[in-house]
Amino acid sequence: MEALHQKIREQGIVLSDQVLKVDAFLNHQIDPALMKLIGDEFATLFKDSGITKIVTIEASGIAPAIMTGLNLGVPVIFARKQQSLTLTENLLSATVYSFTKKTESTVAISPRHLTSSDRVLIIDDFLANGKASQALISIIKQAGATVAGLGIVIEKSFQGGRAELDSQGYRVESLARVKSLKDGVVTFIE
């Protein structure tokens, strides 16, 4: 997606050969016009997949997930990292390791919002080692629902997440596939 590539080139900051900072438009400050384009693109890619729900993890996946949900006309569920007093029932949950935060947390979704008849699209801001995606897949399977695909805003293709998801047979659509962050330069897979 050229608009996303351009935004990454202009405002992304390479912190190391493993870390790309995009807080100017995606995961701290949000560019609504770009999120609309991202939602449009994911909706086009998955329009014929029978999606009934979108699932993401709070917080950075919420903006692209909402815009995709708006386009597809389906609800968006975000897995919570912190248990709320309002989440009182037995939760669907999984443990996830954050590559950038170097921490492990439990994410959870209420079983009231996900059923065995749902076809779920996972939307996330980044795909690195695939741990967040695997946690969401686990939660969706606990509900007996079907994973219809994954929409990733930025994929770090040099890490193993995509290969693992591909080997499990999941459809993965990434809007920006980063080949390398070497020497402070973002190189895309075109």
Curated annotation (Swiss-Prot):
Q: Which molecular function term from Gene Ontology is one that the record holds? A: xanthine phosphoribosyltransferase activity
Residues at which 5-phospho-alpha-D-ribose 1-diphosphate binds:
128-132
Q: List the record's Gene Ontology CC terms alphabetically.
A: cytoplasm
Q: Which Gene3D superfamilies match?
A: 3.40.50.2020
Q: Which domain of life is it from?
A: Bacteria
Supply one GO BP term: XMP salvage
- Which EC numbers does the record give? 2.4.2.22
Entry's localization field: Cytoplasm
Note the PANTHER family from the entry.
Answer: HYPOXANTHINE/GUANINE PHOSPHORIBOSYLTRANSFERASE, XANTHINE PHOSPHORIBOSYLTRANSFERASE
Query: What binding partners and quaternary form does the record give?
Result: Homodimer.
- Protein name as annotated: Xanthine phosphoribosyltransferase
Q: Which organism is it from?
A: Pseudomonas fluorescens (strain Pf0-1)
The beginning of the lineage is: Bacteria, Pseudomonadati, Pseudomonadota, Gammaproteobacteria, Pseudomonadales
